[in-house]
Amino acid sequence: MLRYLMVGSLLVLAGCASTEHKPIPDDPYYAPVVPEEPPVALEPTGSIFLDSQAASLYTDIRAHRVGDIITVVLTESTQATKSANNEIKKGSDLNMDAIQALGGPVTISGNPLSLGYSDSMNTKREADADQSNSLRGNISAHVLQVLANGNLVIRGEKWISINNGDEFIRVTGVIRPQDITTDNTVVSTRVANARIQYSGTGTFANSQQVGWLSQFFLSDWWPF
C-alpha cells in the first residue's frame, strides 16, 4: 500500500511541473528583417547620378518602411494590490423534550430521557498580494510590416551577457507613425498590443525560480 501511495505522490508532483520554453540567443523569430528592394529601372540620362538613389537633406529619417530600425524607449511601471477575505460560519442545534410514554416521561435511573444535538463550523481565509514592477531602458527593433492604415508592426530583441548568465529584452507591437519622434524613437507606452519580455538565463535566473516542492504547496493540488 505504501508503494502505491509513493507512486501516486510522484505522479502528482510530476503533474505540477511545467515544461517552460527556454529562450535562446539568435532566435530565428527575432532575426533581422531584410527588405526586398524593388527593381529599379535605369534612367537614360547620361549622368552617373540617379534620382532614385539620391538623398535629400530634408528627408525624414523616421522609420516608415519594412526593415527600418526604430528605438523603443522603455518606460514601464506597474503596481497592483489585491486582497480577499472569506469567512463561512455554519451551525445547527437540535433539542427534544422528555419522551412521553404510557402517560408519563420515560426515565433512566430516575432521569427523564431527552435528546440534544449541537454543532458549529467556522472557516476563515485571508489573502493579500502586492506587486510592483519598473522597467527603464532602450531597445532597437525592426519594422516587420507596414499595415494598410500606415501603422508599423515592430519586433526586436537584445541579449546581454553578464557574469554567469545572459539577460535579454524582447519587444513586439504596433506603433503609429505620428508617435515616432524626430530622433526616430517611440516610448513603450505608445506601443499597441505590446509584448515586452525582460528575463534571463543562467545561474542567477535559476536561483529565482520556485522549487518543485514549493510549487506543489502553492498549486491547486494542495488541499489546505
From Swiss-Prot:
It comes from Shewanella amazonensis (strain ATCC BAA-1098 / SB2B). GO terms for biological process: bacterial-type flagellum-dependent cell motility. Residues 1-15 form the signal peptide. One of its GO terms (cellular component) is bacterial-type flagellum basal body, distal rod, L ring. A lipid is attached at C16 (N-palmitoyl cysteine). This is Flagellar L-ring protein. Keywords: Bacterial flagellum, Cell outer membrane, Lipoprotein, Membrane, Palmitate, Signal. Assembles around the rod to form the L-ring and probably protects the motor/basal body from shearing forces during rotation. One of its GO terms (molecular function) is cytoskeletal motor activity. It is a lipid-anchor. Belongs to the FlgH family.
